[in-house]
Amino acid sequence: MYPNLYYAFRDLVGVEWKFLRFVNSFGFFVAIAFIVAAMVLTAELRRKSKQGYFQPTEMQMMVGQPASLSDILLNFLLGFLLGYKIVALFILDNSATEDPQAFIFSSLGSWPAGIAMGLLFAGLKWYEKNKQKLSKPEKRTVRIWPHDRVGEITIIALVFGLAGAKLFDIFENWSDFLKRPADYIFSAKGLTFYGGLICAALAIWWYAKKHKIGFWHLNDALAPTMMLAYSMGRIGCQVSGDGDWGIENPRPNPYSWLPDWVWSYNYPHNVNEVGVPIPGCTDDKFCTQLPVPVYPTPLYEVIFCFLLFLVLWFLRKKLKVPGYIFAIYLMLNGMERFLIEKIRVNNPLDILGFHPTQAEVISSLLFLSGLGLFLWLRQKAKTAKPAEPLKNN
């Protein structure tokens, strides 16, 4: 396992760059997942725009204005934070940056680097605005298509997704949270997928309504994108060993063609530092492995969800009713997660004598919601007048 990129580069390339301790493997793959998802979503929204499913919105903006004081101060602040914390990882003593997460949330940093980066960012903003300055600023009308807003959609999904994932993890582990609330809030660990999905979905719904983006067509474009992003994000879970593994599986591998680490795995050097000491490990951290191998469920989800992405990607041009792809996504997502929960470690709930996990409850609701939505959309399509196109919002 590689808790962060420092250990990955040390093992794979043979270099020891201390600043790479700052980049968690899980966070790295989540970032890659968001970037790839944004690219796929842009391509799909552009395709739908060419087919006439989306229309642009117009907005007026002032051009040719010089940089305002708020522009300069905001960029100075961003540059200062980057220099004070991130650049400091390169130049401060190793003892100060040995634990990157603790360092980021501490008051430690480099004032000279912060001020220098702040001045650089502020200067670049002033130069950029001054270069575009007109003798007389003017108001122009611009047309913005949905695919032009993918950057904003991605940021909204990231912010609300992470917040929702953290909140749902806190609810799922409420007793542990009460014992050490600060650790839970500021830790990079502990993220619940469905919490992120629900909160991000609500935020994107509000954004689409605000900017008059066809809701069902947007969801159809998001469906394969989210499945692909989830698959790629689970690579981070597997590589870092963040605790999202399965139940114990001490049985020997019965399949000669299947690698042993696919059948069961003990997650050495896992980021949660769970398990027993690894013989011969001399690192200060991440020197544990599980005493009994478990099902590597993140790896299974990487494979299964990528296959489901291919299914959705194939169907997106075959199904013409707006919302069908999204409904199928809900059903496939719910089914996949419900099945994987059977071999996953989770805290069970107590509901009327039954003990499902939070993910099993939500995945069941997702499947039923997807099924109900599909049937409703099909009935709506049947009763729609032939000359009247089905509304997409």
Locate the predicted segments by residue.
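Hydrophobic, membrane-interfacing alpha helices
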Residues: 1-393
